[in-house]
Amino acid sequence: MNAMRSTVCLLACLAATTAVQAADTYLCVAEMTTGFNYDANKKAWRSADFRSDKKFAISRSKTKAYAWEAKEVGDARPAATCEKDFNEAGNLFCSGVFDLRFNRRQLRFLYAYPIGYWSDGTGAREGENTPAMAIGRCREL
């Protein structure tokens, strides 16, 4: 009876460990978003809080050049790619149109969209892009 309990316990532990390691996709939803926007009337940049409706998926990359990729929900193309896999602390670092930091143990992320203010070039309207930062949580799919 004890041997049977030990076996069942061992199998349950192995299944739980495998499930944690096997997650190939995470769905992430922003909870708070802040940044800067341009007030055209005052011709000045201001700090701003934005709607937190950002959703994206982090999944194993389909190309060999990257370990992971992040796509905004509804977009087929990755907006950020992650060259390396998760590190020992469970952190993943991705960059592209936006920068992303994700911890798979905490299931929390930090998203940064750095385009605008400093990067709007010739032909771009002042304030066309609004730099923003979001934090939120992810869940395994």
Predicted ranges, named:
Residues 1-8:
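Bacterial N-terminal signal peptides that target proteins for export
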Residues 12, 16, 31, 85, ...:
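General secretory precursor processing signal
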Residues 12-17, 65-72, 78-84, 119-128:
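Short, intrinsically disordered, charge-biased short linear motifs at domain edges
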Residues 18-22:
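Sec/Tat signal peptide C-region and signal peptidase I cleavage site
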Residues 27-68, 100-102:
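Short, solvent-exposed loop/hinge segments that bridge or flank secondary-structure elements
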Residues 42-43, 48, 120-141:
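Edge beta-strand at a domain terminus
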Residues 60-106, 136-137:
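Contiguous, well-ordered beta-strand patches that form the walls/edges
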